[in-house]
């Protein structure tokens, strides 16, 4: 059986003999953070590694709203129009099955593109553009078939986590009477942003804990990204609004 490019690259990466080889591999996997500039680059590295998952909401708008509206397709609401005991919809019209699955697919495709562009890129010399499959192996649970399907499954899983976090935030907002009404924002920026970010990083910590995106050196930058998520989310929403993918800039 022909060895995949990722397997060959990983075998070569870890093939050095003895302690010198081990230290060399560890050095290549380290994320320098001696200066403020290094830390800023690591924050950008985290943003790029997790960017496909963060963009799941854009994919959800594409598959759940723009495409159905453009081609006259009917989307299917996740809550089926059901009303909670508080008199509000469980989730609302903004949460559809097409958006949920489409968001995951969008993220999966973006991780495949990232792997294609940055395959083999290491932290020691290529930050912030790191291969998301840098230390992945065929024995990993998400490696189904080959490296490309592995990249897709990784992205799809984190994108789905993003969408589930967004749904959780929406559910809580509606229970608190903070649901969005037409052009009026829900006035709950933290519930609009933090749940999906937390779900993404929790999913990564549980399901991809041995991957480069969960390297211990990236823990402080990950915390920084969570804190910055409201600003990042707002920026993506404005971009989606200007591209015509969203009807409102929030």
Region spans (language model):
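Selective transmembrane helix interface/packing segments
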Residues: 206-209
């Amino acid at each position: 059986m022909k060895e995949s490019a990722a397997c060959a690259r990983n075998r070569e990466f870890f093939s050095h003999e003895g302690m010198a080889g081990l230290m060399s591999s560890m050095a290549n996997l380290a994320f320098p953070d001696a200066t403020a500039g290094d830390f800023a680059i690591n924050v950008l590295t985290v943003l790029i590694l997790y960017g496909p998952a963060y963009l799941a909401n854009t994919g959800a708008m594409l598959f759940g709203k723009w495409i159905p509206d453009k081609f006259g397709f009917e989307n299917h609401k996740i809550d089926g129009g059901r009303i909670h005991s508080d008199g509000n919809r469980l989730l609302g019209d903004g949460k559809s099955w097409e958006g949920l699955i489409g968001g995951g697919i969008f993220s999966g495709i973006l991780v495949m593109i990232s792997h294609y562009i940055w395959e083999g890129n290491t932290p020691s010399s290529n930050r912030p553009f790191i291969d998301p499959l840098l230390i992945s192996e065929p024995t990993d649970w998400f490696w189904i078939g080959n490296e490309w399907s592995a990249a897709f499954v990784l992205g799809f899983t984190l994108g789905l986590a993003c969408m589930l976090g967004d749904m959780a935030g929406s559910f809580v907002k509606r229970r608190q009477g903070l649901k969005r009404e037409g052009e009026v924002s829900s006035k709950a920026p933290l519930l609009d942003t933090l749940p999906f970010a937390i779900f993404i990083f929790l999913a990564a910590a549980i399901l991809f804990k041995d991957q480069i995106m969960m390297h211990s050196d990236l823990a402080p930058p990950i915390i920084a990204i969570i804190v910055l998520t409201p600003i990042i989310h707002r920026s993506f929403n404005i971009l989606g609004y200007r591209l015509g993918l969203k009807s409102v800039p929030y």
